[in-house]
Design a protein with these regions (language model features):
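Membrane-interface helix-loop junctions and terminal tails of multi-pass membrane proteins
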Residues: 1-143
Length: 143
């Protein structure tokens, strides 16, 4: 791996991490700290996160910030195949890094929220907090 590719992968890692840190941090504040954020504010914060990430990484790596974007660009011959795997690995690692950082900063509030609401991790009730990091169908929906 040459220095240019390393720099691009570091940019993708940091950009993806920054993007998800902003968004997940916003959702943590909403659900755990009682922040009174409406849909408008949440969208603005996510938008600010992606805008900063794109601004910081576009000149270095092209600001893909998502494996789906990298793979789509490769499939349509706008991105070299030898960079796909390193970019995707960097993006996935950055996503986990951003999520872990947000979890670490709010970890005490996670524990307090679980205690106050008698939640057991892995139970159906815990999906309320798990939905900060991922999406799940509503419990009332059936297939």
């Amino acid at each position: 791996m040459n220095d240019s590719l390393k720099a691009q992968c570091v940019a993708e890692f940091l950009g993806t991490g920054l993007f998800l840190f902003f968004g997940i941090g916003c959702l943590c504040a909403l659900k755990l700290a009682g922040a009174s954020l409406g849909l408008w504010e949440i969208c603005i914060i996510w938008g600010l996160g992606i805008s900063l990430a794109v601004y910081l990484t576009a000149g270095i790596s092209g600001a893909h910030l998502n494996p789906a974007v990298t793979i789509a660009l490769w499939l349509f011959a706008a991105f070299p195949g030898r960079k796909v795997l390193p970019f995707c690995v960097a993006q996935l690692a950055g996503a986990f890094g951003g999520a872990v950082l947000a979890y670490f900063l709010y970890s005490n509030l996670f524990i307090d929220f679980e205690s106050a609401h008698n939640m057991v991790r892995g139970s159906a009730e815990s999906l309320q907090l798990a939905s900060i990091f991922s999406t799940y169908p509503a419990a009332a929906l059936n297939i």
